[in-house]
């Protein structure tokens, strides 16, 4: 048809990565209309909906995180719904998930904390588990003091063992 508009899209080239970036940044920027547009544009262009579902789940964990734990459930449920229904019905679940993520409260604190811990562990030496935190399934381990002086948090006021240490020796509490 002469009046048909040509869409700019490629399944793995620059247009693909530009559009997935626009989708992710629209969610991060709390713009549901733009997020839904980019998702729909990619689906219309032939993007693998399973790839998009995976990216939507990642957005929930990376950009919304603990600010709205329900977002992670919705993203996972949308991916599972797509797997169960396929296209085109399952695409609605992906669209609704994108809208929810875009309007959800945002926090990348968990993402940043995990990356900082990962970087620290990679450069740090291997530290021993403190004796009071060690498992003591045998008599010998108990005799060696494994688990001795561990304070069971549920037996403490407000289920909090104030002053108990959980990090390896030599590591300062944050």
Predicted regions and their residues:
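Extracellular and organelle-lumenal recognition/adhesion modules and their flexible linkers in secreted
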Residues: 1
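Conserved helicase/translocase motor-coupling segment
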Residues: 5-41, 54
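Terminal-proximal interaction/regulatory segments of ATP-powered molecular machines
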Residues: 29-174
């Amino acid at each position: 048809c002469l009046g048909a508009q040509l869409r700019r899209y490629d399944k793995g080239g620059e247009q693909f990565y530009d559009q997935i970036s626009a989708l992710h940044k629209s969610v991060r920027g709390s713009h549901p209309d733009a997020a839904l547009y980019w998702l729909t544009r990619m689906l219309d262009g032939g993007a693998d909906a399973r790839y998009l579902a995976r990216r939507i789940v990642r957005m929930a964990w990376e950009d919304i995180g603990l600010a709205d734990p329900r977002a992670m459930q919705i993203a996972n449920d949308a991916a599972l719904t797509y797997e169960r229904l396929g296209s085109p019905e399952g695409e609605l679940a992906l669209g609704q998930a994108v809208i929810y993520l875009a309007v959800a409260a945002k926090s990348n604190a968990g993402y940043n904390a995990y990356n900082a811990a990962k970087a620290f562990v990679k450069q740090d030496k291997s530290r021993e588990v403190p004796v009071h935190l060690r498992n003591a399934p045998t008599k010998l381990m108990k005799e060696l003091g494994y688990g001795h002086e561990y304070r069971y948090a549920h037996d403490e006021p407000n289920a909090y063992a104030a002053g108990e240490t959980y990090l390896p020796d030599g590591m300062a509490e944050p």
